[in-house]
């Protein structure tokens, strides 16, 4: 028996709900629904936020040309493109290995570039970014 793929996009004035792809192949089907509202330009990024199966501590570039963030702790369709002020800040002090750091460090970085943790406990969370 062959496969049938459907693409359904419904757009309203305030949002668009995309359902894609719907593949009907014998007895199985897959449906993914994502709701995106128009960008909220004056909103504030919420970190960390949950999107699909991940938790994000900084702006992401998932299915977009530019980095964006969620305006809710769990993504509910409200978002905005990130500006320089929106990116996650370093958390000080943070714990790395057996030391507490009060500023960016190059410890453990192969190329000597300074970095910081985005949570208080790098050993547990392993979330970081390079320092500017």
From Swiss-Prot:
Keyword Disulfide bond found: yes
GO molecular function: heparin binding
One GO BP annotation of this record: sperm capacitation
Tissue expression pattern: Expressed only in the epididymis.
Family matches, as Pfam families: fn2 (PF00040)
Disulfide bonds: 45-69, 59-82, 90-116, 104-131
Keyword Disulfide bond: yes
All copies of domain Fibronectin type-II, residue ranges: 40-84, 85-132
Keyword entries, A-Z: Disulfide bond, Fertilization, Glycoprotein, Repeat, Secreted, Signal
SUPFAM superfamilies documented for this protein: Kringle-like
Glycosylation sites: 53
Domain of life: Eukaryota
GO cellular component annotations of the record: cell surface; extracellular region
Location of the protein in the cell: Secreted
Signal peptide: 1-17
Stretches assigned to coiled coil: none
Family per record: Belongs to the seminal plasma protein family.
Free-text function comment from the UniProt entry: Binds sperm in vitro and promotes sperm capacitation. Specifically promotes capacitation induced by high density lipoproteins (HDLs). Also binds heparin, phospholipid liposomes, and weakly to gelatin. Does not bind chondroitin sulfate B.
Protein's recorded name: Binder of sperm protein homolog 1
Source organism of this protein record: Homo sapiens
């Amino acid at each position: 028996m062959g496969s049938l793929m459907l693409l359904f996009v419904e757009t309203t004035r305030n949002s668009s709900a995309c359902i894609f792809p719907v593949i009907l192949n014998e007895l199985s089907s897959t449906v993914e629904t994502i709701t995106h509202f128009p960008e909220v330009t004056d909103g504030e990024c919420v970190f960390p936020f949950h999107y699909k199966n991940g938790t994000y501590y900084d702006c992401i570039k998932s299915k977009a040309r530019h980095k964006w963030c969620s305006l809710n702790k769990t993504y509910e369709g409200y978002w905005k493109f990130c500006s320089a002020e929106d990116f996650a800040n370093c958390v000080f002090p943070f714990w790395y290995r057996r030391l507490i750091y009060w500023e960016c460090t190059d410890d453990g970085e192969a190329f000597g570039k300074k970095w910081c943790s985005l949570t208080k406990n790098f050993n547990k969370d392993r979330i970081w970014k390079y320092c500017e």
